[in-house]
């Protein structure tokens, strides 16, 4: 079994792993990759897909669960969902609330357990590693 000591190097490896997962997900799901590329510029902070699309159980009736730690342009993101034919369910935490409550909020472990980061990997990893 391998382990990493906490520090800059460990955070860098974890950030690279998150980016690699995003690349793999985009290759496996080109339709969602296009959606992500339109949503990412509308987010200031970290954008995280979780739920059925992240764990591979989504079907044609599934919405896209998107968590934002920071700010985003809600109406534009919802419009993108309508254009592509599925609802986008947004959960938004101001960055300071995410930073403070990451390990105490009962909702956030679901996001941490199974997710695909579409933006802001460094901040997300830095806070999750604490």
Language-model segments: which ranges?
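Catalytic core of pol beta-like nucleotidyltransferases
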Residues: 1-45, 54-61, 69-130
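Glycine-rich beta-strand-to-loop/alpha-helix junction loops that act as flexible
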Residues: 50-52
């Amino acid at each position: 079994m391998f382990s990493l000591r906490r520090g800059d190097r460990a955070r860098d490896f974890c950030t690279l792993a998150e980016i690699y997962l995003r690349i793999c997900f985009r290759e496996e799901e080109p339709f969602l990759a296009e959606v992500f590329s339109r949503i990412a510029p509308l987010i200031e902070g970290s954008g995280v897909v979780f739920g059925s699309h992240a764990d591979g159980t989504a079907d044609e009736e599934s919405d896209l669960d998107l968590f934002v730690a920071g700010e985003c342009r809600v109406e534009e993101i919802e419009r993108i969902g309508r254009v592509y034919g599925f609802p986008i369910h947004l959960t938004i935490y101001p960055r300071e609330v995410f930073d403070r409550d990451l390990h105490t909020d009962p909702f956030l472990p679901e996001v941490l357990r199974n997710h695909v980061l579409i933006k802001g990997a460094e901040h997300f990893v830095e806070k999750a590693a604490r």
